[in-house]
Amino acid sequence: MGLFGWTRFGDFPHIRPTSGMNSLSQRLISMAALVILSFTGCGTLAGKQPARTASPDLRYDFALIGDVPYDELQATHLFPNMIEEMNAARLAFVVHDGDIKSGSTPCTDEAFERVFVQFQTSRHPLIYLFGDNKWSDCGRVKTNAFDPSERLQKLRDLFTQSDQSLGQRKVALARQSSEPRFAAFRENIRWTHGGVMFAGLNVPGDDNHFGTPEFGPRNAANIAWIQDAFAIATKENLRAVMLIMQANPHFDLAVTNRLRRGFNEMLEVIEKETLAFKKPVVLVHGDSHYFRIDQPLLGSRSRRRIENFTRVETFGNPDVHWLRVSVDWRDPNVFRFHPQYVRKNLLKH
């Protein structure tokens, strides 16, 4: 890691605007630019279909965001500032890895709908994954004690209405709900772009809702979705796999720890699939609210870091910034990561 540079890649004419959501849009916004601090992505050992875009771009950029907006200031100023800068950038799409409100505020329909409308102001396709503050934490007294399962269904009804992304341009998404045994799980998605498999999962922090009646079926669905993503990536000789979810799976905790137990089986599957795939694998998540890139997954036998696996955690409350990811087929690491600090959101230290 530790490469400084500029990136400038082409536009994406094959992703066309579609109608239907434009009435929700507030505005299109323009121009912003920042110096890029870039990090190489993952190490490399060697050099039912998912939805895919129309042409296999060899180089492109996309954005990763998460854990925003959390409060009124973020919702009315800081989050729109970030959307403004992303709208001015050349991006294939934007992925939000979960949590669009604080865990201490009520899980109302109005809170959901407000952010849904804001997502439609994205000029780029926007893909949203579910986080704990929007459903699994909604049973807390301080959130007005909503039923988590009912709130999860509300999220599905609002944010997964079609088999396309949100935003003013669209990306087609394959949903796990197309498989009869996983018909409930519309939020689990995948798509391919430029030789990379992207798979989004419903994995909420802090503990993946472990020990609840809904955990078992959802965990089984997530594991099957991960396995399918790797199987397709292998069959189609794709260059890399990126898994995206909200929860920090607590790589640093003992497997017996209360917070880790809900992730153990999933991490075992990710380890097995990563070792078999042998190409770059990236796990993106939010939850802990600070930007980092590291390689925390250890081999079960070697107890050494698995070289082709990288964890990326996105910015989050109170830091309302975004991460640019550059993809290049010709780079053996495939991904490079560039934190983008929103000029209007910078603090005076």
Tell where the protein language model's regions lie, with residue ranges:
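His/acidic metal-ligating clusters that form di-metal
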Residues: 55, 86-93, 192, 197-199, ...
